[in-house]
Amino acid sequence: MRRHTLAIAILAALASTASVAETSDPQSLLIEQGYYWQSKKNPERALETWQKLLRLSPDQPDALYGIGLIQVQQNHPAEAQKYLARLQALSPVPRQALQLEQDITVAVPDNAKLLEQARELGEPEAEREQAVALYRQIFQGRQPQGLIAREYYNTLGFTAKGSSEAIAGLQRLTRERPNDPIVALFLAKHLARNPATRPDGIRALAKLASNNDVGGNADETWRFALVWLGPPKPDQVSLFQQFLTVHPDDSEIRALMNKGIAQGKGGGTWQRDPQMTKAFKALDDGDLKTAEPLLAARLAQKSNDVDALGGMGVLRQQQERYSEAENYLVQATRLPGGAAWQSALNDVRYWNLISQSRDAQRAGRSAQARDLVAQAERLNPGQPGAAIALAGFQAQDNQFDDAEAGYRKVLARHPGDPDALSGLINVLSQSGQPDEALKLIDSVSPAQRAKFAPSVKINALRATQVGKLAEQRGDLKAAQAAYRQALDADPENPWTRFALARMYLRDGQIRNARALIDGLLKSQPNQPDALYTSTLLSAQLSEWKQAEATLGRIPTAQRTADMNELATDIALHQQTDIAIETARRGQRPEALALLGRSEPLTRNKPERVAVLAAAYVEVGAAQYGLDMMQKVVENNPNPTVDQKLLYANVLLKANKYSEAGEILREVQGQPLTETGRQRYDDLIYLYRVKQADALREKNDLVAAYDMLSPALAQRPNDALGVGALARMYAASGNGKKAMELYAPLIQQNPNNARLQLGLADIALKGNDRGLAQSASDKALALEPGNPEILTSAARIYQGLGKNSEAAELLRKALAIENAMKAKTQVAQASAPGTSYNPFVGLPGQRRQVTDLTVAGAVPPPIDAPTKSVTSNAFASATSNDLSDPFVPPSSIASIDSPELSPARRALDTILRDRTGYVVQGLSVRSNNGEKGLSKITDVEAPFEARMPVGDNTVALRVTPVHLSAGSVKAESLSRFGKGGTEPAGSQSDSGVGLAVAFENPDQGLKADVGVSPLGFLYNTLVGGVSVSRPFEANSNFRYGANISRRPVTDSVTSFAGSEDGAGNKWGGVTANGGRGELSYDNQKLGVYGYASLHELLGNNVEDNTRLELGSGIYWYLRNNPRDTLTLGISGSAMTFKENQDFYTYGNGGYFSPQRFFSLGVPIRWAQSFDRFSYQVKSSVGLQHIAQDGADYFPGDSTLQATKNNPKYDSTSKTGVGYSFNAAAEYRLSSRFYLGGEIGLDNAQDYRQYAGNAYLRYLFEDLSGPMPLPVSPYRSPYSN
């Protein structure tokens, strides 16, 4: 019974630990999830959840306990002990520490066996006593915790003397586990068993009786307790009444209650010169202003006064004018009675050496500084000053471990030394040990603090450590508050300002951060550290030009080694930024060359290598960049955590989320420097934001928000995270919420053009066209000369339907890019490294530069082969063997296939649909039909001239057509015309079709009107209107509809009309009706369906009706920007009211089965290159065709009777059908295109061939890859 109850309760007990607060905040949700996964025996998911929680709050007790418990369960006691130590280090020690300590103890095999024995003992009191003894042997005097405590106290309560202790223990557990119904039930039972507390037990059981988990047990025990109570006293009657309210039919309990109610009714020495006495007293008091004139006056009276010389030496020492002090003291020691000043002289020499060492350190002469400190140490080994100075130098050189050891060594010999103490506090603070620094500060007594140098602001230091600890926990608000407190205590400290400014940055408060740093610069415009921190802020904001300018204001002589290193960092970032911008303009070879020339700037420093590697990723050489960073890690046998984090950053840039995540998980929980902690936090933040964006793009908004929410909790006002959240809301259709999120970002950064464009994008998705327009215009006003801004604004204009304005913006962007490109080429021509050569890549010229430009080399004879050279950026990593597609070509080798800038690509996209052109084609179509009847040879020479008009296009189409069916054979005359015997001659016709067309590409709208070829036997008005658009809710879904009147081109009869030998004319059929279709395509698979209904009308031809239905599905077996392969299944059905597939008078001469079914397997391959695009399509399948019998002369009963009522036989066939089509287009130049197409259709005994060619001339230049798939130009009359 007991064991069964415990098993039921495990889940509830685990959950109760975490349910203290509402689960609306991320931490509470994670606590609940962690205990849930542990209750489900899923340690992997639980560990992942606890690690997420620790990233939010590094000291969160539930997370530390959860991971510790997993280590216990997986038999890793040493790892579990580490988490126990972390819990025990918290103040106050949380209950989870006691629980984990017990779990570790119970997991010891001997204790586990004892626990098993205790649980196996039965109900008799003697066995319970034994069980209690076993439990206590496990606890070893510690207070029982958790589930084991619950079972222990329950067992203890049933022993002779254990009731009171059991009740007290269970009462404690109910406070610790308020949502654990098992604990409440055990406590209620033991209270009910004890006569003194039975009424309390009954009340508790009454409450538990309605509990879903323990209600049945509680209800049963409730009744027993009332029976044990017996007839109630007057104040106990309500206990029975409450039970009877729930169980009104329980006569035994009612009788007991009634019984209780019924029972309740009854000497003379030498004296120093008074002036000298006064001077020395002032000197002792530190009153140098009083002492100096007195000593000077004495020396004026008596220049060899030993005490005056010695006193002046001490005064100069206190003024830190050590050379002068040494001079005075040397004179004093050489006079009679001057031996007393020897120790003062030694002291001055000691401090003079230390002063000189500090000057050397400031000048960057570290070796000389250390030599001077060593001399001072030898001069006075007992003085701590030299050791303190050395530790300070080590701290300045970031040798924090050595500095810490040095300070601690001094304090061991000179406890409480104020300089060593303050130095150690600073080192602990700088080396990422704010907790240790805080403990040390709090241990310093007021008396010790009073001895600190005036420059040591201990209260500011303490607040700074509190801020750093809050920062480590991810509590930005607490960190900001602490740093503000530190700034109040030390307002002139630039580093405290910088710490607070960093918090503002992480909270998205860029303006506040800049104002804070600039505030100090206004009052101290030339203070080196103020300028330095301002430079660092600009660096964090990637404002490299401003960083360079600010750092340049610090005189070279006053720059520290760190400042000089920062100057190199700035130079590298400026170079890489130029390279990235160059690549964005489509000049990838030039960008790679710039990066190659930047490599010496890294000086193999991992942080700089990471910057350069990230830049290679940005310009498209991702693998090369990753290899650079991988070498940094692999070349170090024991790579530091910082180096791993740098590599993870480059992996994130390259969208290698899995590899980056592995490093971040590996680093998690490891000790980090302050810089490492910040880098880790930034990477985790960026990782979550990028992953959230990726999930949003997959339309998994729930997972995207879950991924982003911890990042938002960490930095609730950061533009990156809030922008990602806004995009989620926009994707969900909640544009209002998205714009609400963007509002404070814009308020904080009103002059950020990219933010304005982000707002415009969201406004456009929310159909707020006015805001989209105004935000785009604001961005353009802020950065009118930035090609990237112009290109992005053009995309917004396109979405607003303003394609002409969009094209103008893109042309402006291209003009700016071309101007920049010219400057880059001039710069390259004069720069070292790979030479610029303007003729590389021109028609008939080399595609690489040669080695003839190498300075100092003797050129080979002109008849000798000349080698091509590669950019030094790739010299060691790649080859120029263009025959191997898997080896990336060098930067110069790729110039024959230049990357296009986004502006060029965007303009090409607009122009491709809208630019004017003229095109002349020639097409031929023929079949294997019967001569004179179903045979047709169709030759057309379509011409089209298209012009843009605003955001629309209009076109004029002129299509000469010649049709020929051959001559009707004599034996076929009965099946032609009215069946006369007169020879019909050759069946042919010629004419010219005319039409005008209109198109609005943005609206998916097309319309045309014209006339079928003039000159044909019959011509008529033809045209149509169609629309094809995506659904607004999901652009993967599309719909289309059209209404049209089109000629039926199956034969000469249906297209042009026929005339027999007797002059009878008929034919010229048109299909009049509409078609609708729906489709879905997510770039992985597609489905579609369509339906159409048409009335077929002709001259002297029986009217007919056609109904068609079809659908299909296809899969992308390959889908890349340059090639696609699809395979599908398609089905269609078609029916005509009448069979008109004949050529006698009254028939239309077109394929018109009464039942047509087709099931096919289509496949399509398409590929695109820079100048060539082609596609091949084929389909094979089964077809069933059934045609009813028909009169020879439908609609003319007299003629039908005259001819003895002849009829065509019905037919029904099932067989294999197939088709093949190939199309291609080649760009002859930026304006001339040559294209063509061939096709074959085969259905049982019918076969048709078709081919066409065309030459197109564009009125504007187009570049970039050819469209995929190719869309060949066809005659308006093509099927």
Swiss-Prot record:
InterPro entries, per this entry? BCSC_C, Cell_synth_C, TPR-like_helical_dom_sf, TPR_rpt
Origin: domain of life: Bacteria
Q: Where is the signal peptide?
A: 1-21
Do you know which Gene3D superfamilies this protein is assigned to? Tetratricopeptide repeat domain (1.25.40.10)
| Record keywords | Cellulose biosynthesis, Repeat, Signal, TPR repeat
Which PROSITE patterns does the UniProt record give? TPR, TPR_REGION
Q: Which Pfam families match?
A: BCSC_C (PF05420), TPR_16 (PF13432), TPR_19 (PF14559), TPR_8 (PF13181)
* UniProt-listed GO biological process terms: cellulose biosynthetic process; UDP-alpha-D-glucose metabolic process
> Phosphoprotein among the record's keywords?
no
Protein's pathway: Glycan metabolism; bacterial cellulose biosynthesis
Q: What does this protein do?
A: Required for maximal bacterial cellulose synthesis.
> What is this protein called in UniProt?
Cellulose synthase operon protein C
Organism (species): Pseudomonas fluorescens (strain SBW25)
- Gene that encodes it: bscS
